[in-house]
């Protein structure tokens, strides 16, 4: 007898080997129809998988995350099936699942057109409607190589040839198409109903620019029509909010071909940058951080000690001078340890907090660059806390509360918390890891945060908390980090004198709240769709005249506004052009300014202004003092 244990703890008995589909059918016809796969322990398997011994089993449906993964994986194969039907000369390569969808790479004699994409999607729907069974078979490696060579699928043959000789490989067939795959897959193509092809892009075979350029077709697939529509709507919103588009329209920045992956900030964009940086500088100052500044170029011997030269060199920009090798720093932490090591440190000096707006460089591949979100040169709000193990809990608790306030001030209220715990390969004692992991989790509990645990996802040198923002359209951005590090102080020989008079290693806490300032500003632009809160807006007020008779009055208003707030002048522009007032209002509205002040003869005579708020809201005529009170309140409340 074979005993199958279901998720609710109940058991079912079977006389002999039984498939996942048969177990589902024994539970109910509805579940049998909905079943996409099965999960035995942590392994997801086909519904045709035969269970030969007592096992725990859950039936995977479209409602499960694993079910969505199977749908997307199978839809990638459906895409390849449709392409081969329409373009028999195309060669298939690989087609993995990615975030929110999938892609498949093809080799073909000409580029696929938008019309081709529409035809492929239509053919996919037709093939899905046939509800053809998806059938798995296993071949010895060499036989599989010969099989795909015989089909003219040389890329597939190359992939299989790289597999060890003694391994078998699995193939999946649907209708007239068969593909190499580990699986699992849906039981039939009829399970694939809600998908859309998104775009075609270029991709090098095996990611190597020396190889042939392939065509990558991207698609998305979902469990329900509603989820697909929600996702497509989110993409439409994301396109409207695209920071690259808004950066051009609002004249904030540009990326230039002469320096790919680095940002040219225009005056308005640099004003925004300065506001973010000065805010974070106040955060440093008000929370016990000492701001420091380290060099950007450091000798390779330092990077050898930290392990970066061995493990990370391909991502570093290197140079040579006077027969010495140097690298542009990809991170700030080694420099902070060098500062810590200057002079003798006592246990009384701990915790010692350093903060730096450190410019870093990483040699990201060109294909991975994305506006100001993914760049090669970036600045971090990088902080490092040198402390003892006993300090970790208090430091992490204070940091989480601080991070929550910062995110709230920038308009983010939905934060996801994750604790990444010890991997199998690690340094440090189990006792130290126990203490550090407990401190991280307790710090989140003390801050009232619900969190998930990511077992084994910590770095080899310590556990960490990841803080992820959820934006206005549901996208997630991992920005903040609190990383415990037992390793780098050891590697770079950092010490302090303990209460016992002996030498001890400090624990190092790496922390960043916004992370890359470039990326965070990109997130801010997209979160607010370019309509930045008043306190961040590069231009807060535009003063417009109706006729030339109000020019001097408008200049006077602007001058008063620029001096209106103590320690903070308002950012004001005047528009005195001889243009229709409706034209000028529209132009400044498109720049998403928080306020537009209009002055005609009546306003000039009354010593007042007509106020228009963003969103075409007419607030009527008010005195300049009343307007200053209004905008001061906006700035103070960070709206």
UniProtKB/Swiss-Prot annotation:
Superkingdom of source: Bacteria
GO (cellular component) term, any one: cytosol
Entry annotated with the keyword Kinase: no
Swiss-Prot/TrEMBL GO biological process terms: threonyl-tRNA aminoacylation
Chief subcellular location: cytoplasm
Catalytic activity: tRNA(Thr) + L-threonine + ATP = L-threonyl-tRNA(Thr) + AMP + diphosphate + H(+)
Pfam families, alphabetized: HGTP_anticodon (PF03129), TGS (PF02824), tRNA-synt_2b (PF00587), tRNA_SAD (PF07973)
Cofactor note: Binds 1 zinc ion per subunit.
Subcellular location: Cytoplasm
Region of interest called Catalytic, as start-end residue ranges on this chain: 242-533
GO MF entry, a single one: ATP binding
This protein's record includes keyword ATP-binding: yes
Binding annotation for Zn(2+): 333, 384, 510
Subunit: Homodimer.
Family statement: Belongs to the class-II aminoacyl-tRNA synthetase family.
Full protein name: Threonine--tRNA ligase
Species in which this protein is naturally found: Acidovorax sp. (strain JS42)
């Amino acid at each position: 007898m074979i005993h199958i244990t279901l998720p609710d703890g109940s058991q079912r008995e079977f006389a002999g080997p039984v498939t996942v589909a048969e177990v589902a059918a024994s539970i109910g016809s509805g579940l049998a129809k909905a079943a996409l796969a099965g999960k035995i322990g942590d392994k997801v398997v086909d519904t045709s998988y035969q269970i030969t011994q007592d096992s725990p089993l859950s039936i995977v449906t479209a409602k499960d995350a694993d079910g969505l993964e199977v749908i997307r994986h199978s839809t990638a194969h459906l895409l390849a099936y449709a392409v081969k039907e329409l373009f028999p000369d195309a060669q298939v390569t690989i087609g993995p699942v990615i975030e929110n969808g999938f892609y498949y790479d093809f080799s073909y004699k000409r580029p696929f057109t938008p019309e081709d994409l529409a035809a492929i999607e239509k053919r996919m729907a037709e093939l899905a409607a046939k509800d053809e069974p998806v059938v798995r078979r296993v071949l010895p490696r060499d036989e599989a190589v010969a099989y795909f060579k015989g089909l003219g699928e040389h890329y597939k043959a190359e992939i299989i040839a790289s597999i060890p000789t003694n391994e078998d490989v699995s193939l999946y067939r649907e209708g007239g198409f068969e593909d190499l795959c580990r699986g699992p897959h849906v039981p039939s193509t009829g399970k694939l109903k809600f998908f859309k092809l998104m775009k075609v892009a270029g991709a090098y075979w095996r990611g190597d620019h020396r190889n042939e350029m392939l065509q990558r077709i991207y698609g998305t697939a979902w469990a329900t029509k509603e989820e697909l529509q929600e996702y497509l709507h989110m993409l439409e919103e994301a396109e409207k909010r695209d920071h690259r588009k808004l950066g051009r329209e609002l004249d904030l920045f540009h990326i230039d071909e002469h320096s790919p992956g680095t940002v040219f900030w225009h005056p308005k964009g640099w004003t925004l940058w300065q506001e973010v940086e000065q805010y974070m500088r106040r955060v440093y100052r008000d929370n016990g951080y000492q701001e420091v500044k380290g060099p950007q170029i450091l000798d390779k011997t330092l990077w050898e000690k930290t392990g970066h030269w061995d493990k990370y060199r391909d991502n570093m920009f290197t140079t040579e001078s006077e027969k010495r090798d140097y690298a542009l720093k990809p991170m700030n932490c080694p420099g902070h340890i060098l500062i810590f090591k200057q002079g003798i440190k006592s246990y009384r000096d701990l915790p010692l907090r350093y903060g730096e707006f450190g410019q870093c460089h990483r040699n990201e591949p060109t294909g991975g660059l994305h506006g100001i979100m993914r760049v090669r040169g970036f600045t971090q709000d990088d902080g490092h806390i040198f402390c003892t193990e006993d300090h970790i809990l208090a430091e992490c608790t204070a940091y989480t509360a601080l991070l929550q306030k910062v995110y709230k001030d920038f308009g983010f209220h939905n934060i996801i918390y994750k604790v990444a715990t010890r991997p199998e390969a690690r340094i440090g004692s189990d006792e130290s890891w126990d203490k550090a992991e407990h401190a991280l989790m307790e710090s989140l509990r003390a801050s009232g945060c619900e969190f998930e645990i990511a077992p084994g996802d910590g770095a080899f040198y310590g556990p960490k908390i990841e803080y992820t923002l959820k934006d206005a359209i549901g996208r997630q951005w991992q920005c903040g980090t609190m990383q415990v590090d037992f390793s780098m102080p050891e590697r770079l020989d950092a010490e302090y004198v303990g209460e016992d008079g002996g030498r001890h290693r400090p624990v190092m806490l790496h922390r960043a709240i916004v992370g890359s300032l470039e990326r965070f500003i990109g997130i801010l632009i997209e979160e607010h769709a370019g309509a930045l809160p008043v306190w961040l807006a590069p231009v807060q007020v535009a003063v417009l005249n109706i006729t030339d008779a109000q020019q001097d009055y408008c200049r006077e208003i602007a001058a008063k506004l620029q001096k209106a707030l103590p320690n903070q002048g308002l950012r004001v522009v005047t528009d005195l052009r001889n243009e229709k007032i409706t034209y000028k209002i529209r132009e400044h509205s498109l720049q998403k300014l928080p306020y537009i002040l209009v002055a005609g003869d009546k306003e000039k005579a009354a010593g007042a202004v007509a106020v228009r708020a963003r969103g075409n809201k007419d607030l009527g005529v008010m005195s300049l003092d009343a307007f200053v009170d209004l905008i001061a309140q906006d700035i103070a409340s960070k709206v």
